[in-house]
UniProtKB/Swiss-Prot annotation:
Signal peptide: none annotated. It comes from Homo sapiens. This is NADH-ubiquinone oxidoreductase chain 5. Keywords: Disease variant, Electron transport, Leber hereditary optic neuropathy, Leigh syndrome, MELAS syndrome, Membrane, Mitochondrion, Mitochondrion inner membrane, NAD, Primary mitochondrial disease, Respiratory chain, Translocase, Transmembrane, Transmembrane helix, Transport, Ubiquinone. Core subunit of respiratory chain NADH dehydrogenase (Complex I) which is composed of 45 different subunits. It catalyses: a ubiquinone + NADH + 5 H(+)(in) = a ubiquinol + NAD(+) + 4 H(+)(out). Changing residue 458 to T: In LHON; secondary mutation; does not seem to directly cause the disease. The gene is MT-ND5.
């Protein structure tokens, strides 16, 4: 056990020297990116040893050796939890980050601030590892906020572009909403459990109230871009492609799912939270799949596929299977990073063209990228014996066998079918057919820093699922025998999506429809959600805020102070200073009656 913990500690501390060297020597040399990449690669190799030892020993370890602060009732210490989730995730995150950094050497070669870019990527990785290994909520919150601020810095990397700055601000604002839930849970647990350690919280609050659980669900929805807090995820594509690959594969977007996995022992006893998680994930996975079906930006298609897979992970947690959700996190990291790399390779070679309608015929000119893109898309769709199949097939089988919401299960199956449809559509429009880009485009994919990381991730997309599945057991054993039609459900919906994509491609080529349907506009405009929330609602709010004070000022105060006040003063003055009432008949009668009385007396 000592060797196990020592090797893990060495893995985590090996990533710190490249950051410290920038403090000592700010004027970094051109070799700094290669140095950072080599450190991450070496750390990945080192991390395999403690992970292998952990699989053999099968014992969790908690390292707690430095006290941060001590109050009268609470003791806060630096604590690392080395269990299935952290020990399996560390090598996956390091492997994917290593490949992305090597890819960045090619993609960001001409960037003048490439050294700072690599430093940001490394800090991004470190904050995610802090989040994964944290054994108390405060330490987890440090990693949580760390990935948030690093995503802001990396999305706005090209700060001269207004869209990049807007996307970065959008990401940080949506995550602030989720952070409200996290801080609410922090406050509740310290008040009721007097601790932020998950073990103590589970012992003292086996059935906590809905308040902290709803806070954790809100935090996960914000960080993992669930429906309602999702618009920042496709907008984050304004950042460089390596940032998109790291953001969507093994760092920020899976942090929310990982939070729910960590606190699943508290949430599993609450049927309401489980149902909310299930329904939120199901709606998200369907909505994202529908939006991806009609997008034309290759990076946004992959981004919406990430949102759809995050919804599927939420569904898995909702059916009380956190181990399967974690399995899907690990398998998803390989082919999602590779899909972004292939997209970046295509975009870079086509002179920053991202519209798939202006591509085509790349299978012959970019064979390795095309092959890897096909493997990644098929793995995303859940094609048998690729990495994605091992997790998606288990998830769908478990959902079919669970006493769960039939509505949520149905739309999850529809979303799985649509995943196959938009993956096939991307392959057909990008790689097949006649070239639709300028003929003088110089395409070259012979750079080793481009090919090697894609090859590694392609191997991971082929074999990683089989290797990881054998080391992650579900929380409860599967039913040993199930009907054949349930066993083939995942395969059936995958092939149904494939046929749907072929049919849509045929309709597009033959122009069977002269004008798009309303459903097309709903899908292409992302359900009109950004237009309503980012344009209409703020406009109405600002218009109301403008009109209300103006009307109050004009109709109330200005009119009351000047015209009405003067009029009231004049009326009151005339009433006080004058007894003339304007009653002529009464005045005449009052004059006439004394005259008559006088005449009567005289006579």
């Amino acid at each position: 056990m000592t060797m196990h913990t020592t090797m893990t500690t060495l893995t985590l501390t090996s990533l710190i020297p490249p950051i410290l060297t920038t403090l000592v020597n700010p004027n970094k040399k051109n070799s700094y990116p290669h140095y950072v990449k080599s450190i991450v690669a070496s750390t990945f190799i080192i991390s395999l040893f403690p992970t292998t030892m952990f699989m053999c020993l099968d014992q969790e370890v908690i390292i707690s050796n430095w006290h941060w602060a001590t109050t009268q009732t609470t003791q806060l210490s630096l604590s690392f939890k080395l269990d299935y989730f952290s020990m399996m995730f560390i090598p996956v995150a390091l492997f994917v980050t290593w490949s992305i950094m090597e890819f960045s050497l090619w993609y960001m070669n001409s960037d003048p601030n490439i050294n700072q870019f690599f430093k940001y990527l490394l800090i991004f990785l470190i904050t995610m590892l802090i989040l994964v290994t944290a054994n108390n909520l405060f330490q987890l919150f440090i990693g949580w906020e760390g990935v948030g601020i690093m995503s802001f810095l990396l999305i706005s990397w090209w700060y001269a572009r207004a869209d990049a700055n807007t996307a970065a601000i959008q990401a940080i604002l949506y995550n602030r909403i989720g952070d409200i839930g996290f801080i609410l849970a922090l406050a509740w647990f310290i008040l009721h459990s007097n601790s932020w350690d998950p073990q103590q919280m589970a012992l003292l609050n086996a059935n906590p109230s809905l308040t902290p659980l709803l806070g954790l669900l809100l935090a996960a929805a914000g960080k993992s871009a669930q429906l309602g807090l999702h618009p920042w995820l496709p907008s984050a594509m304004e950042g460089p492609t390596p940032v998109s690959a790291l953001l969507h594969s093994s760092t920020m977007v899976v942090a929310g799912i990982f939070l729910l996995i960590r606190f699943h022992p508290l949430a599993e006893n609450s049927p309401l939270i489980q149902t909310l998680t299930l329904c939120l994930g199901a709606i998200t996975t369907l909505f994202a799949a529908v939006c991806a079906l009609t997008q034309n930006d290759i990076k946004k298609i992959v981004a919406f596929s990430t949102s759809s897979q995050l919804g599927l992970m939420m569904v898995t947690i909702g059916i009380n299977q956190p181990h399967l959700a974690f399995l899907h996190i690990c398998t998803h990291a390989f082919f999602k990073a590779m899909l972004f790399m292939c997209s970046g390779s295509i975009i870079h070679n086509l002179n920053n063209e991202q519209d798939i309608r202006k591509m085509g015929g790349l299978l012959k000119t970019m064979p390795l990228t095309s092959t890897s893109l096909t493997i990644g898309s098929l793995a995303l769709a859940g094609m048998p014996f690729l990495t994605g199949f091992y997790s998606k097939d288990h998830i769908i089988e478990t959902a079919n066998m669970s006493y769960t919401n039939a509505w949520a299960l149905s739309i999850t199956l529809i979303a799985t079918s649509l995943t196959s449809a938009y993956s096939t559509r991307m392959i057909l429009l990008t790689l097949t057919g006649q070239p639709r880009f300028p003929t003088l485009t110089n395409i070259n994919e012979n750079n080793p820093t481009l090919l090697n990381p894609i090859k590694r991730l392609a191997a991971g997309s082929l074999f990683a699922g089989f290797l990881i599945t054998n080391n992650i057991s579900p929380a409860s054993p599967f039913q040993t025998t199930i009907p054949l039609y349930l066993k083939l459900t995942a395969l059936a919906v995958t092939f149904l999506g494939l046929l749907t994509a072929l049919d849509l491609n045929y309709l597009t080529n033959k122009l069977k429809m002269k004008s798009p349907l309303c459903t097309f506009y709903f899908s292409n405009m992302l359900g009109f959600y950004p237009s309503i929330t980012h344009r209409t609602i703020p406009y109405l709010g600002l218009l109301t805020s403008q009109n209300l004070p103006l009307l109050l000022l004009d109709l109330t105060w200005l009119e009351k102070l000047l015209p009405k006040t003067i009029s009231q003063h004049q009326i009151s003055t005339s009433i006080i200073t004058s007894t003339q009432k304007g009653m002529i008949k009464l005045y005449f009668l009052s004059f006439f009656f004394p005259l008559i009385l006088t005449l009567l007396l005289i006579t």
